[in-house]
Every structure is written in structure tokens, then in C-alpha cells.
């Protein structure tokens, strides 16, 4: 407490893969120079024009893991820098914590200044490429089961597998379990 008033707790939480969309951050990039500068810094670190892919796609390219991961982090960092610049605040100093869902943990590390922006971009580029190589495009998939408990999710996965890989991959939240495996089983 400060002078009889309760001090506010701040957190910044970053999204995981799957929330990407062509044109994301477009208004932000058109309005705030710091947002454009952030993406230019990431483009330079990667040696490619990720900004153009984010702005105009095509969607099937943006959704590839090797592109989606650095793209989501890029927009997350652009949002963060706009908030810091326009609000004249340093979120890394004024937040109680930062967090992220899955991929968003990397954005949280960059927001906390535990990783530099260029290093985070390169790390996610490499991570995304490795994940993309692990499963050829169109062969693997994921599906969220809503309202299922783990034992029911396991039964559904076992029945769906029919000789293919299909299993619970992530206990996302109470009532949401993600199955992953061969697309034919999903």
C-alpha cells in the first residue's frame, strides 16, 4: 500500500501460436513509428522481410511454424514498445510479472529484457524451422477438446488413432485438452 491506497499489480501476457493472422498489427504499424522500427529491427536480425509476410501473406505462408513464431513475437514486441513509448513507461520495471502461453513465453522473456529482441527473433526463427522440419506440412495437426477430462481425452485419442499417432499433447486449462498427431487421426 502507498498512502492508504493499494498499489496496482501489473502483468503483461503474450499469446501463443495459432493467434496469427495476415494483417495483424496493421493499424499499429501504420500509426506508430516505434512499431515499424521494431519490425525493421527483427527483419534485419532475420535477414528477410517478415514485415511484408505479416502485412500481406499469403496466409498459408504466415501459418507455417517457421514464420508464425517470429511473426507473433514481432507483433507482441511492437505492441509492447508502443505501450511503453506512448504511455511513457518501462514495462520491464513497472510490471510485477510477464508471462506467455507456449510460444508467448519467448515474447515474455524479451519483454523482461532477459533476451534481446534480435536474439529472440533468431531463436524463434531457428525453433520454428526445426519444428517445421519435424513434421512435414499437412501431415500433423492439433485439435482442442473442450469440456473433456484427461481420461476422456485419452479414450478419444486412442479411438481416433487407428494405427496412427494421436495423443493428448497439452492440458491447456481446466476443460481444454489439446490432442496432436497425424492429421488423418485428428
Task: Enumerate the language-model features and the residues they cover.
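Alpha/beta catalytic cores of group-transfer enzymes, especially the acyltransferase/condensing modules
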Residues: 17-19, 111-186
Amino acid at each position: 500500500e502507498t498512502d492508504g491506497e493499494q498499489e496496482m499489480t501489473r502483468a503483461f501476457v503474450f499469446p501463443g501460436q495459432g493467434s496469427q493472422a495476415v494483417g495483424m498489427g496493421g493499424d499499429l504499424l501504420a500509426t506508430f513509428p516505434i512499431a515499424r522500427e521494431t519490425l525493421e529491427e527483427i527483419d534485419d536480425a532475420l535477414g528477410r522481410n517478415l514485415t511484408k509476410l505479416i502485412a500481406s501473406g499469403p496466409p498459408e505462408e504466415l501459418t507455417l511454424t517457421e514464420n508464425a513464431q517470429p511473426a507473433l513475437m514481432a507483433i507482441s514486441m511492437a505492441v509492447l514498445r508502443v505501450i511503453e513509448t506512448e504511455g511513457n513507461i518501462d514495462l520491464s520495471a513497472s510490471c510485477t510479472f510477464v508471462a506467455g502461453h507456449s510460444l508467448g513465453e519467448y515474447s515474455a522473456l524479451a519483454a523482461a529484457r532477459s533476451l534481446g529482441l534480435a536474439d529472440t527473433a533468431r531463436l524463434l526463427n531457428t525453433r520454428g524451422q526445426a519444428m517445421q522440419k519435424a513434421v512435414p506440412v499437412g501431415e500433423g495437426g492439433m485439435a482442442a477438446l473442450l469440456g473433456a477430462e484427461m481420461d476422456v481425452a485419452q479414450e478419444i485419442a486412442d479411438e481416433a488413432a487407428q494405427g496412427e499417432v494421436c495423443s493428448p499433447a497439452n492440458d491447456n486449462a481446466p476443460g481444454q485438452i489439446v490432442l496432436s498427431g497425424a492429421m488423418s487421426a485428428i
